[in-house]
Every structure is written in C-alpha cells, then in structure tokens.
Amino acid sequence: MTTSNVELIPIYTDWANRHLSKGSLSKSIRDISNDFRDYRLVSQLINVIVPINEFSPAFTKRLAKITSNLDGLETCLDYLKNLGLDCSKLTKTDIDSGNLGAVLQLLFLLSTYKQKLRQLKKDQKKLEQLPTSIMPPAVSKLPSPRVATSATASATNPNSNFPQMSTSRLQTPQSRISKIDSSKIGIKPKTSGLKPPSSSTTSSNNTNSFRPSSRSSGNNNVGSTISTSAKSLESSSTYSSISNLNRPTSQLQKPSRPQTQLVRVATTTKIGSSKLAAPKAVSTPKLASVKTIGAKQEPDNSGGGGGGMLKLKLFSSKNPSSSSNSPQPTRKAAAVPQQQTLSKIAAPVKSGLKPPTSKLGSATSMSKLCTPKVSYRKTDAPIISQQDSKRCSKSSEEESGYAGFNSTSPTSSSTEGSLSMHSTSSKSSTSDEKSPSSDDLTLNASIVTAIRQPIAATPVSPNIINKPVEEKPTLAVKGVKSTAKKDPPPAVPPRDTQPTIGVVSPIMAHKKLTNDPVISEKPEPEKLQSMSIDTTDVPPLPPLKSVVPLKMTSIRQPPTYDVLLKQGKITSPVKSFGYEQSSASEDSIVAHASAQVTPPTKTSGNHSLERRMGKNKTSESSGYTSDAGVAMCAKMREKLKEYDDMTRRAQNGYPDNFEDSSSLSSGISDNNELDDISTDDLSGVDMATVASKHSDYSHFVRHPTSSSSKPRVPSRSSTSVDSRSRAEQENVYKLLSQCRTSQRGAAATSTFGQHSLRSPGYSSYSPHLSVSADKDTMSMHSQTSRRPSSQKPSYSGQFHSLDRKCHLQEFTSTEHRMAALLSPRRVPNSMSKYDSSAAALNASGMSRSMILLESLSPRPPRRHQSPADSCIITASPSAPRRSHSPRGPTARIPLSLASSPVHVNNNWGSYSARSRGGSSTGIYGETFQLHRLSDEKSPAHSAKSEMGSQLSLASTTAYGSLNEKYEHAIRDMARDLECYKNTVDSLTKKQENYGALFDLFEQKLRKLTQHIDRSNLKPEEAIRFRQDIAHLRDISNHLASNSAHANEGAGELLRQPSLESVASHRSSMSSSSKSSKQEKISLSSFGKNKKSWIRSSLSKFTKKKNKNYDEAHMPSISGSQGTLDNIDVIELKQELKERDSALYEVRLDNLDRAREVDVLRETVNKLKTENKQLKKEVDKLTNGPATRASSRASIPVIYDDEHVYDAACSSTSASQSSKRSSGCNSIKVTVNVDIAGEISSIVNPDKEIIVGYLAMPTSQSCWKDIDVSILGLFEVYLSRIDVEHQLGIDARDSILGYQIGELRRVIGDSTTMITSHPTDILTSSTTIRMFMHGAAQSRVDSLVLDMLLPKQMILQLVKSILTERRLVLAGATGIGKSKLAKTLAAYVSIRTNQSEDSIVNISIPENNKEELLQVERRLEKILRSKESCIVILDNIPKNRIAFVVSVFANVPLQNNEGPFVVCTVNRYQIPELQIHHNFKMSVMSNRLEGFILRYLRRRAVEDEYRLTVQMPSELFKIIDFFPIALQAVNNFIEKTNSVDVTVGPRACLNCPLTVDGSREWFIRLWNENFIPYLERVARDGKKTFGRCTSFEDPTDIVSEKWPWFDGENPENVLKRLQLQDLVPSPANSSRQHFNPLESLIQLHATKHQTIDNI
C-alpha cells in the first residue's frame, strides 16, 4: 500500500458513497477494499454512473444469472470494456481478494467516465443554444442598478471557450460541485426560454460563472458579502447587501485608456415560481465594506486546485476595439470607490429551466454556477461584441440605491436582453422556501450567465464615470452602465429589458452632509415597481458630494409634506443627534428616494429645540405627525432658540441643576411673535404644559448625546442672573393664581394629542411638539420608537423632595385610557366632556414639596369614578420615568394636611411618588397642549415670594377652596369610618352568636338546678351530687385560669385597637368561648372542647350560687326520688362519653397513620438506597469493561440495617438485567443446549438458558468485538454455576456460533461473516442465541451443559454405548438415571444418523404376567432384528432382573449389529448381565461431583435474569449447605444399612430459591421425610445386616452447619432420631454371646434382598 493510495482512500470512499446514495444503498461503505469485493455493490455503482445504453439490457440479464461473486465481477468488467474503458489491468481475482490498488483503479475508471459524460453533455448543450433569440420580459420590479465591473480577457488562449476535460477529481481532490437536480429543486418555469446550464466540473479559468465570496465577518474593513436570495424573486423588500467602504471617498477621474466592453448578462424570467432558497441576507447594524480588486491578468489555473471554480467579471466599456494589458488602478464608482468590484456570487450548477423558445439578439449562454471555495480570486472573463455592451441607467439619483422606488422611469432601450432579479431582504430570507442544498445555493439560481464566443483576451480597463461622487450613506444598488448608445428596436415592448441586479448594502453611517439640493421623490409603501434603464437619453447628472438620508414618511402622511420639502419651507433632519443610526430598515430606504436635501443650519452648542426635534424625527420612522403641525414646528424653530437660551440662564441659577418653570413663561411673555401666544390667558393645563415642556427640554440640554445620566455641574450665577431668577419665580406664583381661575385648558383636547399614547412596551426618548390642523392647538407628546434601537433613555432630575417618598397616587380605570393603550385612534374626541385637564407644575429647584394643580369649577365625574377622583395631575421630568398606567390619577389631601392621623392613607405628593401601579413615562403621562391665547401679559411679581412658604403655596394651588379641601378629607374619613363600622358590625354579630349559645346552655343548667331543688333525694344521693358539683367546680376553675392565659393575644377582637370602643360587654365576656372555638380546629383538642365549655359554665353557675349561700346553707334534699328528671344529666353524660370515644378513635387512627408513614418512609429510604446502588452499577458498566466475577466474590456486603433485597446487582449480567428492566438498552444472550450441534431457527424455551445481557454496541464496534463479548459473557456464566470447574467445558472452544434473527454467524468461519454493522442489527429487543458443539461435530459440550455432569463421565458413557452397544446405569434413587438414559439415547440416534422414532421405551411390569409375556416377545424380537435402534429399559424392578437376564440369554450376541440398549437399575449387583451378555456397567455415585450445587446455582442465575431480581448472598450459602446435609444423611444410611438405599440429590433440587422459603421448606423436609426414612432404614438394617452398633445423629451436623440466621435455633425446630431401642445397653451386651455361624447364615439368606426405596 503506497502513500498515495492511503491518501486517496477517504476521497474515493466519499465519492463512492455520494454516488451510491443515489441508488438503493441505504448504508454507506466504510472499507472500499473489503466492501467492493461484492459484485452487487460494484454493479450498483456502475448503474449509477453509467447511463442506459445499448449494452445495459445484456448486462442486467447476465447479473440476474450470476451464481458466484467472481462471475459477477467478471460481468461488470466486461460491461466496462464494452463501454470503452481500459480494464486490461483489472482482474476479477484482484477485486475479489480485496486488492486496494485494483479497487482504486476501478473507481478511477468510473470517475473518469463520469467526467467524460459531463463534458459531452456540456458541449452538446452549448451547441443547442441559439444566438438570435430575444430575451423574454423580466418580472423584476426593482430599479435598474448599475454595477461597476471590470474584466480581463484571455485572447492568448484560443480554446478558452472550450476547455479540456480535467482528470478525475478523486486523484487530486478539488472543491466538488454538487449536482443539483432541477426536479428536486422545484423550478417550474412558465415563460422562460432559457436553457438550463450544464453541470460542469472542469477547471478552466475561461469558463464564466459567478463565484461567491465568503461571509462577511461584520467588520467595517472587511469585504462584505454580495449575496442574493432565491426567496427574493417574490419579494419587494430590501436587497442583498453591498456595503460601501468606511473611509473617505475619492473623486473619480477618467482613466487614460478607458477601454472596456460590457458583458451581456442574461437572466431567466418568471422566476417567481422557483423553489430555490438562498442563504439569509444578513442585515448588520454596522458599516460594511466591499473589497474590490484591481483588474489584473491572472494566469490559467486549469490544472490547479481551484480548477473547479468558474469565474466571471462584469465590466463596462466605452471603446470595445481598444485593449490594454496593463492593470488599471483601483478607483471608486458611484457610492463605493471605483474599483473593479468582484461580485463573488455562487449559484447552483443547474437551474432546471427549459431551452429558449425565442431568439436572442446577441450571443448569450448560461454560465456555470459553482459552489464557492472560501478564497478570493480574480476572475477572467472574455469580452463579447460591442453591440452587446451598450447599456446605461437612467436614474434620477446618480446610482442611488433605492432611488425611484414606486416611481415610473423611462423604459429601457437595451434590445439585447436584460438581467432582472428580485432580491430578498434580511427579514424575508428566513421564509418557508426550502433550500435544496445549503452548500451549493449561495446565490439566486435564476442568475445564469455565460459567454460562448471566444474573444480576444486582452485586459481592458473599466469605464470610469467622471463624476465626483462621495460616499453614500445609502443602501447602494448598482447597475450596468455604458456610454455607448444604440437605438432600441421597435419590436421590444417597454419594461422588457431591464438589466437589474439588486444588491443592497446596509450603510447607515451618516458621515457627511451635503449642501447640494436633492430632489426628493415620494415613496409609497406598496409593492415595488420596476425601474428600467434607458440607454438612449441619459443626460449627465450633476456630481453629488453626499446624499443625506431623509426620514421615511409614514403611510398616513399626506402628500403636502413633500410639497413643503420641495418648496424649502421646512427642513428635514439630516443627522441622528447623539448616536449613530444603526438600522437598515425602511427609514434608510425612503431616505434615498430624494435626490436633493436642503442643508440644515448649524445647531448651537447647547442643542436647541431644532436639534431635538430632528432627533425626534430620526427616532421615529412613522409618527402621527400632521402637515400643519410640522409647518408650525418649522415656523417656531428660530423662535424657540431664544427659549433655549432662557433655559440655560434659568439652569445656572439653581443649585440642583433644575430649571424653574417661570423662566419659560417669562420667555413666552417676551416673545409675541410666536403665533400671538401670551401667558396672561394660559390656563392651568397650558401653563403647566409650558413649564413641564421647558423642564423637559432642559433635560435634553443636560444630556445632549442621550448617553449619560449625569447632570451638568452648575456654574455660579452672577447677581443679575440671581435677581432675574427671583423675578421669574415670582412670575410663576402669579401664573399659578391665574391658572386657578382659567378653565380654558380643560375644555380643549387636541386630536393629535391622542396619538401621544403609545402601545405598551415602547420607550420614550424625546418630546414631540406639533400643531393641529386648525393651528389652534399645539400638542407635546411622547416620541416613541417603533422598533428597538441603540438609544438609551436618559434619566435626569432624580432629586426628590423631603416628603415625596411617602406620597402615593391612585389611578382610575376608564374606557378611554384603556382604548388609548391599544390604539391612539380609539381615543374619542369627546373626552373633554368628561374630564377637565389639569397639570402639575413641579419646579425642580423646589426641594421641599410638590405643587399640585386643580381647577376650581365643578366637573362631572367620570363613569366608574368617584367624585373625589377627579384631579388629573401631571409630573415634571424630575421624577423618574415610569411605564404608562392605564388608570388616571386620583386627587388626595393637600400637603397642608400632612399632620393627619397615621391610619389615613398618605397618597399625596409628587407624581413620581404617587405612582403606585406605574406612571407614564416622564412628562408624557398626559397629553400637553398649548392653545392660542390673547396678547395679555403676565404681571410682574415681587422678589419676596421666593422666601414664602411652599407648603402654603401647595395648599392654595392644589384645591380651589378650603371647603373643597376639607370636604375631600371628610369624604375619605367617612369612607374609612364606614369600613370600620362594617368591621365592628360583623364582629358584633359573631359575639352575639357566641352569647346566644352561652345563654342556651345557661338555661339548661338553670333547669337542671330547678329539678335538683324540687327533688327530694336521699341524703346519700344528695352528698354524691354535691361531690360531683364540687369536682366540676374545681375542674372549671382550673380550666378557666388556663384559658385566661391562653386567650391573651388570641382572637380577632384582641388584635383590634378599637375593641373597647366598639365591642359590647357581652362580646368581651365571651372571648373565652371564642378561644375555645378556635381550639376545636386542632386534632389534639378534639373531644375536650365541649367538656371544657360545660365545666366552665358549671363553674360560673356554682360561683353565682356561692355568692348567696354556701354548701352548709343549702336546703336539705330529702324525700322520694320519683320526681327527679334525670334525662338532661344522662344526655350530658352520654355526650361526654361520645366525645371521649371519638377522641380515642381519632388518636388510634392517628397512631395507625403515623405507623404507615414510618413504613412508607422506610420503603422510600430503601428505594433510595437501591437506586444509588443501581446508579453505581450503571456507572461501572458504562465506564469499565463488561466483566463479571463469581457469585460469592461479586455480591456486595450487606449491612445489618439493610434488607437483602436492597442489595444491588452482584454481577455484570445481573446489573444488565436490572438495567434492562429499568428501560436501559441491553441485548439478551442465551445458549441453546440442543445436543444436535446445529444452528436452528426453532426456539425451544426448555433448551434456552439465559447467560447474561450484552451492552449495546457502539459505532466503533465490529463483529469480532461482538464475538469476544459473547464468549466472555458465557465464560463468566460458567464460572458462576461451576465454581469448582468440574464440568470441563471451555467457553471459547465449546461455542459453535450464534444466531440473530435470520442472520447466522459461525465463529471462526469467514464465509458466515455478517456484512451489516452491529449497530444496524443489534437493538434492545434483539436476542443473541448461542449454539454449542454437539452430535453433529461428534462432541458432547451441549450434553454436558444440559446434564451438568462432568465431561469425562459423559464421554465415558458415550464411548461405552457406542462400542459395547449395551449400557447399565446403576445408582441410588434420585440421581437422574432416567433422564441421562433418555438423553444418551437421543444423542446416539443423532450420532448414528437415526430418527427420533428409532428410540424404543420398554417398561417391564412388576406383577402382571400377561404384560410380562408381551414385553418378553417384543424385546426378543427387537434384539433379534438387525435394524439399528435404541432400546431403553428404564427402572428395572428388583424382582425382574432375572427375567431380563433370561431374555438376553435367549438372543445370541452380535458385535456390530443390532440395537443399542440402555438399562437403569437401583443396585449394581448384577454380575450376570456384565459377564454373560456383554453389558457395560456404570455405577453413579450419589454425590455426582457437586451436581446439587451446579443445578441450584443455575436455577438461581436463571431466576436472576428472568425475574430481574438480584439473588441475596445468603441464598448461595444455603445452596452450599444442601450437599452437606445430604452427605450427613447418606453417611448415616451407609452405616446403618447399605449404599443401595442412600438418598440421591433429587430430594434437594426443588428447593425454593428464597431465604425464608428455603428455611421453611428444609425444616418440613427434615422433619417429615428425612427423619422417618432414617429411622426406617436403621431398623431395616438391623433386621437385614444385624448392625446395631452406636451411631451419630445427623441432626447435630445439620444444626452445626445451619445457614439461616433468622428465626429460631435449629435445635428447637428440627426433630431428632428416636432409635434408643436399637442401641444395645452395656449390661445386655456383656451377657449376650456372639455366634458367628448364625450371623453368616443370616447374611447368606438376605444376600440378594433389596430394600424398597422411598
């Protein structure tokens, strides 16, 4: 493997995957040398690459008949040879063997063939294009821009238009061009007549195409993206962006040899139905720039890395005949520096359009649009004839970006064709149009340009427009321009040829202002109309130094605004003050619609009102400004400068840097030219409006840039300024007195003022001053921005008065205010009928209080509003800005009542302090209006008012009279008093209810006392009653004293401060009863309440009685008891008993609930502990390898306070099972113990054993890793069930293979390798079934795992039966002889190729002679036949062994013929069968080398996996205990009797695998089975063998090894042997004489006797 091949592997793999994905292959290839060995994959790739031809049917037929892989590869190579490919160096054997060089050579041939096909297709389509067709009309409605272009030619290369086909891109990887299927893209051309471009992969520099640039980084100094979007075909919004350079503009000069030629750019029409999507046009708020590259000659790079990049340059020319080889200097054209701008635009390779149906006027062709490679390169483009280069733009604004929107321009006179394109804005680029490929589509696919004719390749300098054009702060749109003129043919209709390429640059930096007039055209917010380019009559436009962006007028703006602009009566704001405009929305677009701008006058250093108004217009794109209002603002512009000066003078006179309101009023009084406005007739609303507006404007003076909230440090004023300030302060006081008498301001409300209410969520930045249409009302309202911008609100005037923090304000909710929040148009004009406007004048220099204004005349209250809530208060800007509140303000008590009681609500004060639910923003909470007044001037005031009391001023100005002031306070107090009365009444009713209950009970006690008094009781009964009464008295006294302490601070009345003044004597006495009622709520006092209530009542009764007489003076009770009525006493006692019983039951229930809560809490803790342990196990599994230790070593330590079921999984498999049950992904792995040794799809649950769970494979996993994991899992399983390793099974050698669904895998066999990736096949529901070696492989691995017997033992038995043909299995009862015999018979039948019917089971009857004769005949017949069958004689009775011997004696012995015979007997003393009839005897021990342990462990592991329950560690100790107990039993049997009667392991195989269940089961087994059987065996042994020696009780051994720690001791639950009568005493044994002859005769008599087994 060479280095070059290694480098080419990923390239070829990617190439093959890309083409195979077009076919039916759903998964990608990973290893080409291995995957392409399959002829099916090779043929599929060939079918994708090679189109259908005359050899295809034969190739398909041959593939259908292929039977081997080599034949398929040979068929594929023959097919390629027929196609003309050189396959001489390729052989099928090399490909089949996975030779990398051969596979790479094959792929190289296919890629080369693919390139040839593309080249032929491209050349064919070039020939099909007609050069005389006429371009169909374009659908673009965008203005015709001009594009400053440059070009270089390549005349030195005569074959530049027919490039050579490059070699395969796989060998030298290039930037691939994705082939875009037009059917997938969804282009549905309607009237288009253009042929779609061919998909070219050549690397010629002479093939023309658009090439995109990389994305702009947003830096102003980096070239921005020139992009167009396919979605823009149906859009009429902004364009894709070309940003101008953020540097000083230079004057454009004519070059020495301006020799350029126009490139005809053809475009498709009706692209509106195209489904092509394009990248989003990024709208950036910053300046972007266009990187331009001077036109230089670029060498041919056809063989280079960028060979696949097709290039195109757009350029213009004056003289097409002349040429120059020298590069041209870089210059700026139009709005950007006149350089040879490279429009790096990408588009898909195919546009999917149909061939043209009409003739073109000149030679045009479709360009190859390629995928961009992120690099900047200069492009070469050939030049076409001179007649195609004559194109210019007739635009009214010198290459302005959106000049002429919605305006009709002359039709284009270009006859050859047009390039029309809709582009998309950044807002519409994220539409629902689907993009077929984000890699290939970076340009509108409708722009397809090509140049067919080979032209002289001489560098030509661009046509430089000799116009000094400065940098435009516009969205620049450039068009193609040429000064050459050509008359249009008469057949061309208007608007059919519109070479429009819309490119938008979000240039928002208003760097330069121009003094040249700019003609403004009125834009309309409708669908944009097309702007045609006329090439015939284009007069030279005057040079422009700068284009000033005008504000976008609103849709609601009447046309008179444009008239005013043209007449020069008003001046539009030309600059954003204090910040740089950072939006590229419709504001900038409309601004470019004007061609002239009147320069504004220079603003003052302190930011006059004119500048602030200009800022207002900049901040808002579509305000509700009327024409008359704008005219009035313009008229007032110069006059308000003087007010600004007064503002500064007033500001210097106050230490808090706040202006006094009187300065503005004085200024207004001194200027009578302002529409005859005077301050004498100013109403309260109007004067407050003027003062507030003055203060607000002073706020803008302090913060000219809106970027800092620090107030300016005031300078010390002179004496003249101080005196003037004091005089102005006096004017304020007198103006306020006039405001109280004027009602004019409350009567008029401007319609325009309604628009001051904005929708919630917008911030107010500056005031807006406008005059209504009738020029009678001037309105000031908040100026809110319709969209978010970078402006920050300036917070000023945050200087609070001393008592302002405690002031509040309430707002009323009216339908007018709510309507204003939704839309300003919903505010009715008749609101003045319901409200009389009032304003608050709060001079910022007043640092002690708040000035409130209120009109005197009575006003009709609003609906849903109390008469008291009638004052509208407006704050000065000194208060912090708040959001607008939907409620109106509510008037409160003036400041002079500040000493009212504490409980009265203090809701007066400043506007900012009174805003409880949020106030309006600054001074714009209400609409401010200035009305036209008379010429009366305000009188002068004395300077002494400065030292007057501001509190008195507030008290005199807040209300019209003292009567109204006190009436308002009385109304508030009356309302509060009414609330208190309601509270007192409700509490009194409650106390009366309690008193009624108390009276009722007292009546019952009184009645009881009367009965006692009237009754004549016996002395002893009277004494008993007296004792009871005394006892009740003591209890009641004690309870009363306790309740007195408990009632302190309790109850609602005790918390009321006015309890004594409103509560009655009865309510105060019944407070104890109220507290007793509260005690009834608690559970602990349930049942005691009634009793304590009764006892307190009895105590009070006895106290009243004791005041009059004591017990000695009580009348004696004598006489009969027949008149006593005990009903009431009995009822009371019964009620007490019921209460006590109910309390007792509740307490019991409470205890039960507490107990349940404790149980649940313990359960939760257990679950938490288990969850933590499971998480730890999961972490171990995910972090570490899947390994498993033995069962004993892996089970964690369980502490004493934990239960066994809280333990986590003890091994990996158990953890995985728990993880699977909890929803985690894992794969179940089973092993099949079928002795056949074949991988079968038949699932037998009895033969399936779960060995564990496998973790989900990863993307890096392969099938070898799966093999290793499965074998490791099986090895761990064997280590768990066979701890001693007695089975002798090798986990890695005993597994044949595994099956996954229909897929089979034989381990070690490469032919059965699964081609699919493991992650594609293995899921959480998949089961991997392993199969072990068996009879088919002449091995016994599956038989050993099924029987759990040692492998050597099984091999010996199989060898015996195959060689001897007759086998006897002898052993004790319960060892498993019958199952082993049947399994061996089945194994032999498979091993000898016999069917299952060949196994014959013969049961020998014990007593029935007729059946015995039938069995004898049948058995003899089978033995005499020569057919190979297997006979099973299971469990031969003890008295029929002679019968079996006689049957075999009658049949002669045949060595290699006859049936196989397997017999099972309970004893092995059968020498006749072994000696005379060639039987192989196999004696099975009762221990079976740990059979019990292996069987029970396998059961435990099986339950662990199936039930997903972890086995406790104590269970494995219990499993180890069973062989010890069984061995103790068998040792006792062997001592007292013979081995024949020992107990096999079957008795312990059915043990429950739980700790408690196994304990109870073993106790029952020992007491009910083992002890009786041992006693019987011992007695039979004494009779048979005379064994009466001493013995050891096995119960002692069992008690010593007892594994259960819970429960009683084993000595207490286990029975012991009762064999005292069998043990001889020492005295008797000494007297008895042993007779050996008698003993020998007895043994001989019972030699062949057997004892029945239990």
Curated annotation (Swiss-Prot):
What are the start and end residues of every segment in region (Disordered)? 128-261, 274-364, 381-440, 480-501, 595-626, 650-680, 698-729, 747-799, 1059-1083
> Low complexity bias located where?
143-161, 197-243, 310-327, 407-429, 705-722, 1061-1083
* A GO biological process held by the record: positive regulation of axon extension involved in axon guidance
Protein name listed in UniProt = Adapter protein unc-53
| SUPFAM superfamilies, A to Z | Calponin-homology domain, CH-domain (SSF47576), P-loop containing nucleoside triphosphate hydrolases (SSF52540)
Q: List the GO cellular component terms.
A: cytoplasm
Basic and acidic residues composition-biased segments: 388-397
UniProt entry keywords in alphabetical sequence? Calmodulin-binding, Coiled coil, Developmental protein
Its taxonomic placement starts with:
Eukaryota, Metazoa, Ecdysozoa, Nematoda, Chromadorea
Looking up CDD domains in the UniProt record yields: CH_NAV2-like
The molecular function terms in GO held by this entry are: actin filament binding; calmodulin binding
Query: What InterPro entries does the annotation carry?
Result: CH_dom, CH_dom_sf, Nav/unc-53, P-loop_NTPase
Could you tell me what this protein does? Involved in the migration and outgrowth of muscles, axons and excretory canals.
Name the family the entry cites: Belongs to the Nav/unc-53 family.
**Alphabetized PROSITE patterns for the sequence:** CH (PS50021)
Sequence ranges of Polar residues compositional bias: 162-174, 244-261, 595-607, 747-769, 779-799
Where would I find the Calponin-homology (CH) domain in this sequence?
6-115
Question: Which PANTHER family does this chain map to?
Answer: PROTEIN SICKIE (PTHR12784:SF28), STEERIN (PTHR12784)
Q: Which Pfam families match?
A: AAA_lid_NAV1 (PF25408), Ubiquitin_6 (PF23092)
Give the highest taxon in the source lineage: Eukaryota
Q: Which residues form a coiled coil?
A: 962-994, 1152-1184
Q: How does it assemble?
A: Interacts with sem-5. Interacts with cmd-1 in the presence of Ca(2+).
